Design a protein with these regions (language model features):
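Conserved phosphate/anionic-ligand binding catalytic regions in large, soluble enzymes, centered on
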Residues: 44-64, 150-153, 237-249, 305, ...
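Phosphate-binding and adjacent anionic-ligand microenvironments
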Residues: 293, 297-299, 320, 340-535, ...
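An N-terminal, well-structured beta->alpha segment
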Residues: 3-110, 201-233, 241
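N-terminal small/polar loop signature for handling phosphorylated ligands or for N-terminal nucleophile
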Residues: 94-157, 256-311
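Short acidic, glycine/serine/threonine-rich loops at helix termini
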Residues: 104-109, 134-138, 156-162, 183, ...
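Gly/Ser/Thr-enriched, mixed-charge loops and adjacent short helices
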Residues: 16-20, 37-44, 48, 158-284, ...
Length: 580
């Protein structure tokens, strides 16, 4: 079997040596053929899959790697679909990229192919936040767009995300149709290149101003910022695309004391100061938190390399910096927006917010308090964008997000936006201090007293290879056939199955329809308010378990004790479900 695979791989590699590929690529392929069969197999044993979100993979030569040829095939396939879909129109597209190695080269390749296909292309002059690409598609009335990024993946990776006319990532039926067109590009000679460079328009800082002005329209408390303009804010762009625009946005909001983490303000696709540029991880935030402690900063903000995810750390009463999880950041931003909209008399029953089904139920409680509709959708910002699209002209979107550190305020962008989220987090801190004399950490605890203390946890069970994929599938089949009757002693009263799109009332046996997109996700809800969601990852060999528990918080004085109890409860649930 191994020999058979090696023969196929060698044949495929030889086709690269014989085909119209550049000499440097051929040289690398030849080197692997002669010296590293293992790496050659990894690089050629399959084609890098254009999935529902686009491409993501390790950079290198070969059909299973991110390189100008695989990026080229994806772009030609997308171009062919755009021509079919918008026949008779001059197709307009926007192209952006992050700080990763080769991102500029890939973005220029994408722009060249689009231009060679006769499209009007808007290419940013340098790296930009992903949300600005989404904004550009809408602002410049484009039919599509591409951003070259692998978000917060390790440095070896790069990726390619495709967007549609509304500035959101492509969804059905377009995603499947684009995948089919990309699959038809079987030869490098099918890719159009080197024509019509005049079709490319470069976007520069003038366009940034249009975007930043739109972000600034989200401001809700300019008076509070005036009083606390010199609040110390430490910011890290994690060597990425937020480096210019996040500080520029904070300045536009009125903040005058933003301290950059200098070492992480260097644009570098190797991300030399972090293992992985993911603001979800405390060790990634360590440099920013250390600087904040040294400076006595009130707030720590960070963005991932394409500046769509936000990391937030707050100083507590003991002077320690507490790293918020994505649920806490979402609850704070949502509470701030809804409180200010209510105080300004702007809530009239025609507004709504959105969260994903695995994001904290506390967001639902906050929305309910303000009599604002809260939609729950599948994991992924494209589903939040879909709800915004469906409500256009009917109701007003305020904000929303997901537990994985993504938030979007306002509907002028259709993907998560850490530029606006950073500015709103800073403004919320100024407002809380100005109106209540509270830090954001203290206000979050006050919200727990008001709505209940919600606490979340996550476990990822990794099962690699073909066997692993089968095991994950079997786990889901078993969970459907034999769901737990109780979790940590509390009876399971409701089950949501997003595969069958049914909710089961366990006591009565009654089933009701779930109005949602279909997905392989299960949720169990217990009598004591615990929620457990089970979801196999769409992109990695893992199955994720999301836990949500809650308890009343009588007063802030009980915070530490209740926190310990809730964390212990989450650990107990993991053991009960045999995940530990």
């Amino acid at each position: 079997m191994a020999n058979e695979l090696e023969q196929l791989v060698l044949k495929k590699a030889q086709s690269w040596l014989d085909g119209h590929y550049d000499e440097a690529t051929k040289k690398q392929v030849k080197y692997l053929m002669d010296n590293d069969m293992k790496e050659l197999v990894e690089s050629f044993y399959k084609d890098l899959e254009f999935g529902t979100g686009g491409l993501r993979g390790i950079m290198g030569v070969g059909s299973n790697r991110m390189n100008v040829y695989t990026v080229g095939a994806a772009t030609q396939g997308l171009s062919n679909y755009l021509k079919k879909n918008f026949a008779g129109e001059r197709v307009r597209v926007a192209v952006a990229h992050d700080s990763r190695n080769n991102s500029r080269m890939f973005a220029e390749r994408v722009a060249d192919i689009f231009a060679s296909n006769g499209f009007q292309v808007f290419l940013f002059d340098a790296l930009r936040p992903t949300p600005e690409l989404s904004f550009a598609i809408r602002e410049l009335k484009c039919h599509s767009g591409v951003v070259v990024t692998a978000s917060h993946n390790p440095k070896e990776y790069n990726g390619y995300k495709a967007y549609w006319t509304d500035g959101a990532q492509v969804t059905e039926p377009h995603d499947k149709n684009i995948i089919a067109e990309v699959a038809k590009i079987t030869d490098v000679d099918m890719i159009e290149t080197g024509k019509n460079p005049e079709n490319i328009t470069i976007l520069d800082e003038k366009f940034d101003e249009i975007y930043l002005n739109k972000v600034h329209e989200l401001s809700l408390s300019p008076e509070s910022v005036k009083k606390h303009h010199d609040m110390k804010i430490v910011y890290s762009p994690m060597h990425g695309a937020g480096v210019r625009l996040v500080p520029a946005s904070l300045k536009k909001f009125g903040f005058t004391n933003v301290i950059m983490v200098k070492e992480q303000a260097v644009i570098d696709g190797d991300f030399p100061t972090v293992e992985s540029p993911n603001p979800e991880e405390r060790k990634t935030m360590a440099m920013a938190i250390d600087l904040a402690a040294k400076e006595g900063a009130d707030l720590v903000l960070a963005t991932d390399p394409d500046s769509d995810r936000i990391g937030v750390a707050l100083r507590n009463k003991k002077g320690e910096y507490v790293l918020l999880n994505g649920n806490q950041t979402l609850v704070l931003l949502l509470s701030y927006q809804l409180t200010r909209w209510a105080e300004r008399g702007e809530l009239d029953g025609n507004q709504y917010v959105v969260k994903t089904i695995v994001t904290s139920q506390m967001a639902n409680a906050v929305a309910e308090h303000f009599k604002v509709k809260c939609y729950d959708c599948l994991t992924g910002f494209k589903y939040i964008a879909k709800i915004i699209r469906e409500n256009e002209g009917k109701a007003k979107y305020i904000g929303g997000g997901e537990e994985s550190f993504g938030y979007l305020a306002g509907d002028y962008v259709r993907d998560k936006d850490a530029v606006s989220a950073c500015s709103l987090a800073a403004e919320a801190a100024a407002w809380a201090m100005d109106t209540m004399g509270l830090t954001l950490d203290e206000w979050l605890q006050a919200l727990y007293v008001k709505y209940g203390f919600y606490r979340e946890g996550l476990v990822s069970v990794v099962r690699k290879g073909k066997e692993g994929a089968e095991l994950i599938q079997k786990m889901m089949v078993d969970f459907r056939a034999n769901p737990p009757k109780a979790i940590l002693g509390s009876e399971v009263v409701k089950i949501n199955d997003f595969q069958t799109l049914e909710t089961l009332d366990v006591k009565t046996g009654a089933k009701t329809a779930i109005e949602q997109d279909r997905s392989n996700v299960l949720q169990w809800f217990t009598a004591d308010g615990t929620a457990v969601s089970v979801r196999p990852s769409g992109t990695e060999p893992k199955i994720k378990f999301y836990f949500g528990v809650k308890a009343p918080l009588a007063s802030v004085a009980d915070f530490d004790k209740t926190l310990a109890e809730l964390d212990a409860k989450i650990e107990g649930i993991k053991k009960d479900l045999k995940l530990e």
